[in-house]
Amino acid sequence: MILRRLLLAGSLLLATAFTSAKKADGPKISVTKFKDEPVNLFYFDDSDTVMFQDGKNGDVYVSRDAGANWDIVDVSGMRGKAWSLLPHPTDRTKAYIMSNGGTHWVTEDQAKSWREFTVDADLSRYEYPLVFHGKDSNRVMLLGHKCNGLDCKEKTYYTTDGFKTAHLLMENGRHCAWAVSTPTFGEGLDLPKEVNDRIFCVVSGLHSSWAEANRLLYSDRFFKDEQGTEVPLDNGRAVSGVIRTASVQKYILAATKSARTNELALFVTDNASTWHRTEFDGHRVEEDAYTILESTSYSLQVDVVSTYSSTIGTLFTSNSNGTYFTRNIEHTNRNMYGFVDFEKISSIQGIILVNTVKNWEDVEKSNGVQKKVISKISFDDGRTFQPLKVGKHDLHLHSVTDATNSGRVFSSPAPGLVMGVGNTGGHLKDYLDGDLFVSDDAGINLEEKLWTMLINMNSVIKASNWHKASLPDGVQIRAKVLTTAPGSTTLKFLLLGSAKADIGMEYYIISIDFAEMEDALVRRKTSKIGCQIERENEPDADGHKHPDAPEGVCKNPDDKFTGSSGFRLIPGNVCIREGGVDLDKQTERVCSETFKNPPAGQIVVEKSFFTADYYKDYFYLERKESSKGEDETVIMITSEQQIFLSRDHGKKWKQILEEEKITRIEPHRFFDDVAYFLTNNGDGWYTLDRGDTFRKFKAPLPPNQDKLPVLSFHPDRRDWLIWTGADECNGNGGNCHSVAYYTTNLGGEWHFLMRYVRRCEFISRDARGSSDKLVFCEQFENENPSNKHLQLLSTEDWFAEKRLHYSNILDFATMQEFIIVAIRGENSQDSLRIGVSIDGKTFADAELPANVQIPIQRAYTVLESRTHAAFLHVTINNIEDHEYGSIIKSNSNGTSYVLSLSAVNRNSRGYADFEKMQGLEGVAMANVVGNVADVENGAAKKFRTMITHNDGAEWTLMRPPDKDSEGRSYACSTKGGKPTDACALHLHSYTERADPRDTYSSPSAVGIMIGTGNVGDYLSLKSKADTFITRDAGITWEEVKKGKYQWEFGDSGSIIVLVPESTPTKTLLYSLDEGRSWKDFEFSEVEMQIQDISTVPSDTSRNFLLWGKEVGQGKKPGIATVNIDFSGLKERSKQCVLDEKKPEADDYYLWEPKHPLQPNGCLFGHRAKYHRKRPDKDCYNGRELQHLDSIGDICECTRSDYECDYNYEPQSDGSCARVAGLEPLDPKLVCTENPKAVEWYEPTGYRRIPLTKCQGGKQLNHIVAHPCPNKEEEFFKKHPRLRGIGLFFVILIPICLAATAGYYVYNHWDGKFGRIRLGETGSGGLFDRDSLLVSIPVSMVAGVVAVITALPLLVSSLWRSVSGYVRVPGGASSRRPYSSRDSFAARRSDYVGVVEDEDELLGTDDFDDDEEGDERNGQV
C-alpha cells in the first residue's frame, strides 16, 4: 500500500461498503501522544503485540492490543538505557533490547518477560549488532568493541543457548556471519553436519589493516584453538580485499575489491564449501553500484548500475546455483541511495513490476536531464517484460524510489491483488498528479478506482463509497507511516504521524480497529477457478552461455568437445521434460569457438610499427584481481601526439581520439581503470573501463600555464576531481593566475574552489578519520603571486570555512600516514623547517636529529613511507654534481627524527638513490657517497650500495657472490664471508634510470631482486656493469650474466626476461626457474635497439612488451613494439595448484624471509611465511597470488627490533649513545599528550621500530618507569613492589639461614677451622669434610661470605629499584650514570659488578673486528 505524501489526517477517509450497521458505524480509533518520535516499531508475527523504541530517552514501549494502549517496558536496570530494539528475524517470540554498554535484555515470550545478559564489550560502531542463525534461534552472534584509551578492538561474541551464556569468538573481526543465515539455506542439499556450526569472518590482512588486504576466514569450532581457515573463493585460492558477506535465500555472497579499482568481484556458494565467481554477461559490478533485490529460492536477482549514471541500472537474474547472470531488462530506474523500482508481487511467484528510464541516452549524456520513467511487468520471472495497461493506454506507477510508507509498495499477501498510484500516458508524472489504480488479477488488467482495500488472508473487500472518520479530540497530524501486522491477517492498523507542539514536535500513534465492523463487511464471492493451460507442461528456456572447453581437451582449433548448448532451464521452472523441447541438452562444439586460443607450445611474437620518431610515454590500465575480463590494456602517446590503445598487451593497436588535439594523458593516480585525455582548450575525454568506452567532458578553464598538475584525484572517490586552470591568460599578460575548481561527478558540474592557487589536493581519510571533503591548497598570500609567499590552507566544506596552517611554505607532500610540509625559516628565506600531521588538522614541528650537520636546511626529498614511519632525505651538499644528504627516519607519529643513513646520493632534480623492496616490508637499498671528504674538495662522487633489513635501523654493505657467472673468482675477497670496504656488491640505482618504473623488485615476485653493477670497493661505470640477482631479499647475490641488461618479471616471478641495454640485438634471455638457468629466444629477424621492456605493473602477466626501433639491415622506419607472449609455452600452459590447507603439497612452498644478523630467523619480531612457486614446477601462477600465507611465531625482542632514539646515534659496536651536549626528548610528554597514560620511562637511547611485532625479550626502551602525575594508584597496581615488612624479611631470612648453618658446622665439624691434617686417608667420621653434612654447610658458609660482601651492592640495587618507581631526593641513581660502553668504563669504580646479561643492553654485539663494525654502523 502506498500512502500519499501529504495525507491530511485531521480526518480519515475510509472506503467501506456497509449494509445496515449491525455493530458499529465506523472503526474504533485510539490515539496515544508521545513527546519523542517512535522508532524501530515492529509487530510480533501473528499477534497484536507491538513494540517501539524511544530513541531519545532510551525507553521501550509495548502494546498488547495492536497499539490501542502502551506501557513502558520496566525491567530492573533497563529504564533509559535502550540503545536499540531488535526483533528476531525468524523466531516470532524473541526480541532484544540492547544498551550501549555490556548489559542487554532478551524476551522469549513476546515481551511478557525479559531476561538480562551481559558481554564484556560495547556494541559495534559499524555493524548491525546481532547476527542470527537461520535455523536455530538460540544461536546468535554479538558484534561489539572494547576500548582502552585510544586503542579500540572489535570483539565478537557468540551464544548457542540464547545468551544464557556468551563466549568470545574473536578479536578484531570486521564482520562475522553464520553459514546458515537463512531458513532456506541448504534446502535440498545433503550438507555436512559441521556446516551448521560454520562461521565466516572478515578479518584484517596479516601485514596490513587496509581494506584491500582483508581476508575471509571460516571455522567449524568457533575459532577455538585456531586462527581459522582462509576461504578458497577463486578456484581453490584465497582472495584478498574481502569487503563483506551477505546471505540471500539459499545463497551466500562474498564481495571483494582490489586496490586501485572500483570494480568488485562477487563470489557465491549454496553449500558454504564450494565457491564460484559470478559472471554478469560482460557487465562491470562496482562498489556501491549494485543492489541485491528480493530473490527466490531458485535464483538471485541483482540490479547493477550502468557505466556512467548512478541512477540507471540493469536487472540480472542468476541460474540455479547463483553463478551465471543473464540480463533481464536494461535502464532500470534507481536512486542515489541504491533503491530500485522493483517489486515481486506477493504470494504469486514469477510476477515482477519494474520501472525503466525511457530517455536513458539523454540522461547519460547530461546530468541535468529529467528522467522519463515508464512501468513494465513480467509474468515469467523477468525473462520478458510488457507495458502495464489500462485499456489501450500505457500505465506508469510510482514505485520504491518514491515510497514513503513501510512494507510492500504494490501488493499484499492477498493473492493477485495489486494497487498503485500513477498515471497513463507517455511517462510517469509527479506523484501529486497521480491516481489510484487497482488490479485483482495480478496486474493483467488495471482499473482506475477511488477505492481502497481492507485485506485479510481470506477476503478482499471493494468499496466504491468513501466514508469519513474523524480523529478524537480534534487531533490533526501529518501522516508518516500506515502499517499493519506482517501477514496482513488482522483488521487492525497503525498510523504514525507528527504535529507541531508549542516547542518542537509531538508524535502520535493511532490505532484503527475494524474488528467491530466485521459483521457489516460485504464478503466477496469466490467463483470456481479452473486451470487453463495453452500447452501442456511445455518447457521454457532462456539464457545463452559462452562455451568453455574442458581443460586439456583442445589442443588444436579443429578439435571438438561436448559443451553447453547456450540455453538453460529457467530457474524455478518445474516443467516436465519428457516429451518437451530439450534445448539445454549438451551439444558437440568446435574448439575454435572458445574464447581462449589453444596452446601453441611455444613463445608467440607480434611486432607493430608506428610512424613516429619516438614514443613520448606509455601507461598500463591494469585489470585488477577483482575486475572482470582478460584484457591487458596499454595506452601510448607518440612524438606526433598520436594516441594508440591496445587491449591485448600490444598485439594489436588502434588509434583513438584521432580528431581531438590531445596534448597529455593523465592516468588516475588511485584507480587503474581510469585515464583522462586533455587538450589545451579545456576539452577532455575520460575512460572508466580501461579504454573500452570514452566520454567527453568540458573543463571550466584551459589548463594552467604554471607547469602545475592540472588534475588532482581523490584517493577514495573515483568521480571527484580538482581542476587547476588558467584564468585571465589571454596573451595580454597582466593578471594571469591559476584557479581551482572541483567536481563530484566526473566533470558533469564544476564548482569554484579557490583562486591564486599553486596546488590543491584531496587528502585520504584512511587512518585519519577525516571528512571525504578534506582538501589542502597552496595559495599565494593576499592573492598576490608576486610576493611568492605561499600559505597552506585546508577545508572540509569546499572553503566555505578554511583553516590556515602555515603562512610561508615551500611545498607539502602527502603519504598514506603523514602530511609533511616544508616551511621557510622565520629568520632566513634560505632555511627550512618541517611540519608534520597525521590527522590533517593538527601539525607539529619535526624534531630533526642534531647529529645531522645541516648548515642551512635547503632541500628535502620525501621518500616512500609505508611502514608507519616517514623517511626524508635532507640535502647536506647542494652543489651541482656533488649533491648528497642524509636519510632521517621518524617515529610512528612522524615528529621525532633520527639519523638512518649518512651521505646518501642525490641528483640535481632532488631524487635520491633510495629504494624499498616491493612485496616485503623493511628491506631497502641506498647508494651512499663513499668519498665525502674528497667530494667536499671538488672530486667526483664514488658510490657504495648499502642494504637494510630492519627498516633503516641498521645498514650494511652487500655481500658479493663467491664466483661470477663464468665460475671465476672476483679480484677482491670478503672477510669471513662478510663484505668489506674493499670488497662488496654495488648496484646502479634510481638516479641513473631512464624510466623510474624499472625497479629492482616486483610486488608479486617476493624476495627476488635484479640489478646491474659490480663487485669491488666502489660502483664502477654503468658501461662496465654486470647483472645480478638475489632470491632471499638481498642476503646473498648471484651474477647471472656478464654485461648490463634490462629486466622484467612476469607471472609473479616464474618468468624473468632480460634484454641487452644500449646494444642492438635480435634475442632476449628468459628464465623459468628464478634465474638459475637461462635460454635464448630470437624475437626479431632484424636487429633492434630496445629502449625499454615492460609488462603490467603487478608483474602477473605472461606477456611482455619491448619498446624500440629496428636498426639492422632491412630495418623499417619509425618506432616499433614487440609483444612476447609466453602463455602458449608448454611449461607455462597449466595453472599451478595451491591448497590453502596444505600449502606445500602441490606446486608451491613456503618461504620465510630472514634477518642476516639474527640466527633465529625472525624479521620484525615474527616469522612470516610466503607462498612461492617451486622453481622446478612447469605451471603458471595466474592472476595475482596472495603471497603472505601466515604470520607464525611472535619472537622475543632483540637489539634488531630497536633503533636509536632522538638525539642518540649508533656506535661502532651497535649500541646507541647520546650525542655529546644534547638532551633526549622530555619523556614526561607522554603524560600530557595522552591523558590516559599511566607511566613514563626514563630515556635509554633506544626506541622500538614501528614495524616490529616482537613481545617480551629485551625491553630496551622500557627499563625505569615512573608514574604520571595523579596516576600513582594505577601505576602501583600495574607495578606492585616489595616494601615494608616483606622487603625486610627477604633480606633477613637468607642471612639468618646461612649464619645458623655456619655456626652449626663450626661447632660440630671435628676438623675445626685452622687445623691442618696431612696424610690421613681414613674414612673419617660423621663430620668428615667429604661428608654431605659437611660439604653442604661449607657451601652455606661461602654463601654467608658472599651475602656479606654483596650486601652494599644489594642495598644500592634495592635503592635504585625503589627510587626508580618513586623519586627519592638525593639518590645517586636519580639519573642513569651511563649511556654507552665508554662512559660506563669511565665510571667503573662506581660499580661492584654487572650481570652478564646487561652487556647486550649496552650494545656489546659481537663483531669480527672494529673496522668492519665501523663500516656497517658508523655510516648510519
UniProtKB/Swiss-Prot annotation:
The chain crosses the membrane at residues 1285-1305, 1332-1352. It comes from the Eukaryota. It is found in: Golgi apparatus, trans-Golgi network membrane; Prevacuolar compartment membrane. The keyword Repeat applies. Glycans are attached at residues 271, 321, 893. Its main location: Golgi. One of its GO terms (cellular component) is membrane. BNR repeats lie at residues 61-71, 377-386, 644-654, 1028-1038, 1070-1079. It holds the Pfam family Sortilin_C. It is a multi-pass membrane protein. Residues 22-1284, 1353-1420 are lumenal. Residues 1397-1414 have a biased composition (Acidic residues). GO terms for biological process: Golgi to endosome transport; Golgi to vacuole transport; protein targeting to vacuole. Keywords: Glycoprotein, Golgi apparatus, Membrane, Protein transport, Receptor, Repeat, Signal, Transmembrane, Transmembrane helix, Transport. Residues 1397-1420 are annotated as: Disordered. Functions as a sorting receptor in the Golgi compartment required for the intracellular sorting and delivery of soluble vacuolar proteins, like carboxypeptidase Y (CPY) and proteinase A. Executes multiple rounds of sorting by cycling between the late Golgi and a prevacuolar endosome-like compartment. Belongs to the VPS10-related sortilin family. This is Vacuolar protein sorting/targeting protein 10. It comes from Ajellomyces capsulatus (strain H143) (Darling's disease fungus).
